[in-house]
Amino acid sequence: MVLIRVLANLLILQLSYAQKSSELVIGGHPCNINEHPFLVLVYHDGYQCGGTLINEEWVLTAAHCDGKKMKLQFGLHSKNVPNKDKQTRVPKEKFFCLSSKNFIKWGKDIMLIRLNRPVNNSTHIAPLSLPSSPPSQNTVCNIMGWGTISPTKEIYPDVPHCANINILDHAVCRAFYPGLLEKSKTLCAGILQGGKDICQGDSGGPLICNGQIQGIVSVGGDPCAEPRVPAIYTKVFDHLDWIKSIIAGNTAATCPL
């Protein structure tokens, strides 16, 4: 029986794919080194998440990725052979939709992090654009991260893996996730046939559609990549006003209802 879970390895999510004998994921591939300058590795106390650089001083990730002694790495591709322009920062401030940090509430799994100092744009570090409009159904989008590449074993790659998935009708997710509201501020995305999905270790990572961040990895099935069990992503477009207000200095801004 497939169980619902917050895709976290003790508070974290990761991309998940079934493996081929070549050690590549089914339907996915190791990301090109120049394919993800906005991708952030968020980690604390042995846990890891993904994140997205949206300007030189701000990162978007999932609320359930929060933790003490958090660090963020930028410009990272291979964990074993870091790029020369890799940079590390820590949070200066964190902002959440709910003061209780109750990220389980659909559409509230979002955290905006202000860095202790801006990063310097470089060959492997550059921000990703916020959405200009929401994605339509059947849009092909990209997921990526250093998460486990097996749905049944925790096998973490040295470099992030990338795969394409589709924006699906919200009804597909509502059929599996009890309590998911029709108008919740989330996106339903995946492959109905299974085989490509997010999994443990990539919570907070981006769902990228047409060169813009449209979603934040939030919740998925267990095991990962099961047929007709897509994942849920916090919908960035519905939080644009909140994000822009916080960045502009209005720290009292409230999230959409």
From Swiss-Prot:
Report the InterPro entries cross-referenced here: Peptidase_S1_PA, Peptidase_S1_PA_chymotrypsin, Peptidase_S1A, Trypsin_dom, TRYPSIN_HIS, TRYPSIN_SER
Cystine pairings recorded for this chain: C31-C162, C49-C65, C97-C255, C141-C209, C173-C188, C199-C224
Q: Name one GO cellular component term.
A: extracellular region
> What is the enzyme's class at the highest EC level?
hydrolase
Which sites are catalytic? H64 (charge relay system), D109 (charge relay system), S203 (charge relay system)
PROSITE patterns named in the record? TRYPSIN_DOM (PS50240), TRYPSIN_HIS (PS00134), TRYPSIN_SER (PS00135)
Q: What is its EC number?
A: 3.4.21.-
Q: Which UniProt keywords apply?
A: Disulfide bond, Glycoprotein, Hemostasis impairing toxin, Hydrolase, Protease, Secreted, Serine protease, Signal, Toxin, Zymogen
A GO molecular function assigned to this protein is:
serine-type endopeptidase activity
Task: Enumerate the subcellular locations listed in this protein's record, separating them with semicolons.
Answer: Secreted
Q: In which tissues does this protein get expressed?
A: Expressed by the venom gland.
Q: Which domain of life is it from?
A: Eukaryota
Domain named Peptidase S1 is located at: 25-248
Q: Which residues are glycosylated?
A: N120, N121
Q: Where is the signal peptide?
A: 1-18
Positions annotated as pro-peptide in this chain are 19-24
One Pfam family for this entry, by name?
A: Trypsin
- Single biological process term from Gene Ontology: proteolysis
Q: State what this protein does.
A: Snake venom serine protease that may act in the hemostasis system of the prey.
According to the record's subunit comment, the protein's assembly and interactions are: Monomer.
What protein family does this chain belong to?
A: Belongs to the peptidase S1 family. Snake venom subfamily.
Name of this protein: Snake venom serine protease KN2
Taxonomy, top ranks, is: Eukaryota, Metazoa, Chordata, Craniata, Vertebrata
